[in-house]
């Protein structure tokens, strides 16, 4: 294994990409220590410590712990992700954008440019909401007023635009997906703080006699979740494909059997990130309007752990799982390419029948993948922050009030132990290793796994 790691640095291009990625990640972490002017960072951090199991803790997870200190990178990559989702949705429902996307590299560059503009607009709106919320807070702002609001908007919007640039540079000139790696870096850096928090709870017997069992249960659940994530992320449905024999000159070509691999979770962590970014935006914008008689109830209902939020989060994950697959995989193109090269699925007529068959299988396994993402995302979060079933209206709420307090309020530990964070860390790590392995195999080196880079342990569904 050590030799395979040294192979990375024997390839100049791969070595350059990895070092470039690490350098930009270091810049990202450095920016996380530059505070936004005019904010009492100590009071703000104390407030986050008191609300670590709430929605604020969840949002802070995606900013890499920078929201609690309100650094220049406090918005993280959420504005960029939200802008990307909006543009991708518009390409489906708005015909001129769909035509622009099909124009090739020039069209994609135009859409990317519009995504950047929309990112800046969303960052300005979110930073305005944060500034208003801070002014209404408990002495967080040193000098309230229009000057503080404008300075906060300028600082956070500029920081968000710079993060967007960092992510694009990593994707283009580094290794892995830049945006995912930025989230990954923020979560990994915060893990020691989560471990220290868990140790403090154990030392102070935070949950009374239930403390040892709660910690043991949390550790066991984390191990099981990591194993489950690795298992499902490596799982695929293999559709058998047969190629007919063809005579080319004096040679007989084709005739071999192969398969078409369809990943159970083709979207990876993106559906979870997309759904999270969409649902966090109303909270960040509306944080300063919680006492408003028109929007207060809606903002409260959209709070973390509330039944409405839970329902919308689950629906969002399912929607974006299908939406992402529809973008990255086109059954009609796959079927057409198979037909051109003489390939067919045994028992299925080439052409439209083949496309329909692939689409049917893809629909089923995507649902399995979406349900897997929901399970991974929700079960640990219920343990950490609880699910407020007692807030349901009428008799349902009264019935669920009988549940133990830790079920409705959670254990109150850090979100770094949640399913969403584990899913992102494991998923991004596996995707990055796969890209590095592909670079090694392409240059005739063995990958990290035996048999010349062939990944063992694949599971079929």
What are these regions (language model features)?
Residues 1-101, 105-461:
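N-terminal cationic and glycine-rich segments that engage phosphates or anionic surfaces
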């Amino acid at each position: 294994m050590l030799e395979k790691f040294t192979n990375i640095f024997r390839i100049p291009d791969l070595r350059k990409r990895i070092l470039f990625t690490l350098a930009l990640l270091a810049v990202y972490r450095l920016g996380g220590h530059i505070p936004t002017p005019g904010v009492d960072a100590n009071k703000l951090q104390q407030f986050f410590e008191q609300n670590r199991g709430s929605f604020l803790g969840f949002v802070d997870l995606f900013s890499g712990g920078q929201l609690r200190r309100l650094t220049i990178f406090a918005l993280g990559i959420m504005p960029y992700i939200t802008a990307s989702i909006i543009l991708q949705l518009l390409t489906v429902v708005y015909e001129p954008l769909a035509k622009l996307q099909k124009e090739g590299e020039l069209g994609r560059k135009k859409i990317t440019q519009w995504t950047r503009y929309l990112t800046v607009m969303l960052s300005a709106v979110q930073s305005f909401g944060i500034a208003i919320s801070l002014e209404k807070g408990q002495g967080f702002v040193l000098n309230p007023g229009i000057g503080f609001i404008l300075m906060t908007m300028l600082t956070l919007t500029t920081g968000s635009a710079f993060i967007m640039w960092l992510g694009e540079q990593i994707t283009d000139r580094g290794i892995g997906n830049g945006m995912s790696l930025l989230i990954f870096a923020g979560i990994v850096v915060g893990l020691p703080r989560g471990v220290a928090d868990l140790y403090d709870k154990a030392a102070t017997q935070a949950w009374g006699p239930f403390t040892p069992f709660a910690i043991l249960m949390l550790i066991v659940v984390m191990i099981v979740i990591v194993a489950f994530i690795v298992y499902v992320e490596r799982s695929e449905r293999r559709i058998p494909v047969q190629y007919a024999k063809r005579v080319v000159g004096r040679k007989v070509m084709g005739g071999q059997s192969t398969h078409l691999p369809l990943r159970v979770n083709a979207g990876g962590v993106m559906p979870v990130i997309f759904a999270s970014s969409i649902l966090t935006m109303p909270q960040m914008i509306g944080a300063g309007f919680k006492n408003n008689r028109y929007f207060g109830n809606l903002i409260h209902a959209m709070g973390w752990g509330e039944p409405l939020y839970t329902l919308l989060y689950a629906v969002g994950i399912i929607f974006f799982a299908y939406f992402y697959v529809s973008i990255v995989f086109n059954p009609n193109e796959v079927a057409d390419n198979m037909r051109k090269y003489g390939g067919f699925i045994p028992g299925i007529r080439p052409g439209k029948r083949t496309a329909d068959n692939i689409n049917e299988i893809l629909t089923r396994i995507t649902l399995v993948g979406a349900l897997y993402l929901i399970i991974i995302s929700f079960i640990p979060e219920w343990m950490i922050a609880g699910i407020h079933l007692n807030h349901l209206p009428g008799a349902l709420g009264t019935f669920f009030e009988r549940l133990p307090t830790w079920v409705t309020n959670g254990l109150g530990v850090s979100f770094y132990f949640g399913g969403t964070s584990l899913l992102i860390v494991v998923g991004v790590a596996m995707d990055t290793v796969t890209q590095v392995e592909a670079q090694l195999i392409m240059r005739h080196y063995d990958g990290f796994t035996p048999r010349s880079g062939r990944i063992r342990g694949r599971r079929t569904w």
